[in-house]
From Swiss-Prot:
The gene is cpxR. Residues 131-230 bind DNA. This is Transcriptional regulatory protein CpxR. GO terms for molecular function: phosphorelay response regulator activity; transcription cis-regulatory region binding. The two-component system is activated by envelope stress such as overexpression of some (misfolded) periplasmic proteins. Response regulator member of the two-component regulatory system CpxA/CpxR which responds to envelope stress response by activating or, in some cases, repressing expression of downstream genes. Binds to the promoter regions of various genes in vitro, including ompC, cpxP, ryhB and mrkA and, when CpxR is phosphorylated, pecO. Represses expression of the major pilin of type 3 fimbriae MrkA as well as that of type 1 fimbriae FimA. Repression of expression of MrkA appears to be indirect, mediated by activation of the iron homeostasis regulator RyhB. Phosphorylated by CpxA. GO terms for cellular component: cytosol; protein-DNA complex.
Length: 232
């Protein structure tokens, strides 16, 4: 049973969401501020639902602190229209965001999509063949461990960042649409103002060292998508 840590200072909302997620088969822990969340967080937690606006320690500061020690998937719960919070959360390593008020079915679908990605990684570790390790320039991507190394040095990527990078490496030199990336990496259809994939690409550009062959890692093709640049 997957364990979810639900963090929101709205006690009525957390009660309703806990009831919903319990019915969906999840084991739900509840915290009402960031300090409580960090105290409850351990390796048994599979995913966090993290509200932005909270007392004591808000969601942004909580995310910043937990990313220093944990790569647990995080979905940020934001107020509708708070674009700055969404962008900042994604820059700090959130996997996705969901603006309030949200549809219960959409929340459950987002959770299951991210957990499926995590479980895929675990299955790679227990399968002899699994998906192959990919190499681009001095970058090596091991899907079994969800580990990215550049010139022998491990890169600190979130699970979503690794999945996005691996998918682009699988299509090296080919354009992959934002719609396809959103569906495969985040498990959701792309909406007109959804910038999550763009922010994850931006994070990868910031985290990846300069290539030895002098090429950029990615190219943006406006209206078409992204491609990972091949050496040739």
């Amino acid at each position: 049973m997957n364990k979810i840590l639900l963090v929101d200072d709205d006690r009525e909302l957390t009660s309703l969401l806990k009831e919903l997620l319990d019915m969906e088969g999840f084991n739900v822990l509840v915290a009402h501020d960031g300090e409580q969340a960090l105290a409850l967080l351990d390796d048994s937690v599979d995913l966090l639902l993290l509200d932005v606006m909270m007392p004591k320690k808000n969601g942004i500061d909580t995310l910043k602190e937990l990313r220093q020690t944990h790569q647990t998937p995080v979905i940020m719960l934001t107020a509708r229209g708070s674009e700055l919070d969404r962008v900042l959360g994604l820059e700090l390593g959130a996997d996705d965001y969901l603006p309030k008020p949200f549809n219960d079915r959409e929340l459950v679908a987002r959770i299951r999509a991210i957990l499926r990605r995590s479980h895929w990684s675990e299955q790679q570790q227990t399968t002899e063949a699994g998906s192959p390790t990919l190499e681009v320039d001095a970058l090596s991507l091991n899907p079994g461990r969800q580990e990215a190394n550049f010139d022998g040095q491990t890169l600190e990527l979130t699970g979503t960042e690794f999945t996005l990078l691996y998918l682009l490496a699988q299509h090296l030199g080919q354009v992959v649409s934002r719609e396809h990336l959103s569906q495969e990496v985040l498990g959701k259809r792309l909406t007109p103002f959804d910038r999550a994939i763009d922010m994850h690409i931006s994070n990868l550009r910031r985290k990846l060292p300069e290539r030895k062959d002098g090429h950029p890692w990615f190219k943006t093709l406006r209206g078409r998508g992204y491609l990972m640049v091949s050496a040739s």
